[in-house]
């Protein structure tokens, strides 16, 4: 479903202290945009309405987070959900940066100096048609870009409801010299301890769809 345009979204975002309107300006220097410059940096690609980031960020003040999506209409909802989570936990909101960015061009805002330690990819578009598969966030074309700014031993955490995307992504990771260190094809019955349920995850689970999850380590 296409989201209705919200003309008030960008002004609200630009008034937000943790929104970064022009992320390219910080390429290679992201650590210095955070209050605690010594924290490791984790990246969420396609943060959606921010459910995942709101929980992760507020639970882990010792980690800095970059959350990316493309539409202001989505980002403004993420902004509100993140603010709400921090307020409810009485936490200082100083370890999250929210920004608009086309993920296919992620290499225009991050480089090897940024030393990202973990990437989260949750329920991305599966792009099932062969001619579109290069658009997948787990495709080798993208993984090659991630390798540039992901530290050696850094991880990609990937969740999806889509069987074909999951199985083909296993091959993508192998081709790009990642080691699969954890894998389950039924996350909710796997015993995996710290799983933050996203809005898409909840919807798919209610439909009886098993959630696939893996952790891939950069070699």
UniProtKB/Swiss-Prot annotation:
CDD domains: AdoMet_MTases. Pathway: tRNA modification; N(7)-methylguanine-tRNA biosynthesis. One of its GO terms (molecular function) is tRNA (guanine(46)-N7)-methyltransferase activity. Keywords: Methyltransferase, S-adenosyl-L-methionine, Transferase, tRNA processing. It is an enzyme of class 2 (transferase). Its EC number is 2.1.1.33. It comes from the Bacteria. It catalyses: guanosine(46) in tRNA + S-adenosyl-L-methionine = N(7)-methylguanosine(46) in tRNA + S-adenosyl-L-homocysteine. S-adenosyl-L-methionine binds at residues 44, 69, 102, 125. InterPro entries: SAM-dependent_MTases_sf, tRNA_(Gua-N-7)_MeTrfase_Trmb, tRNA_methyltr_TrmB_bact. GO terms for cellular component: tRNA methyltransferase complex. Catalyzes the formation of N(7)-methylguanine at position 46 (m7G46) in tRNA. NCBIfam families: PRK00121.2-2 (NF001080), tRNA (guanosine(46)-N7)-methyltransferase TrmB (TIGR00091). This is tRNA (guanine-N(7)-)-methyltransferase. It comes from Clostridium perfringens (strain ATCC 13124 / DSM 756 / JCM 1290 / NCIMB 6125 / NCTC 8237 / Type A). The gene is trmB.
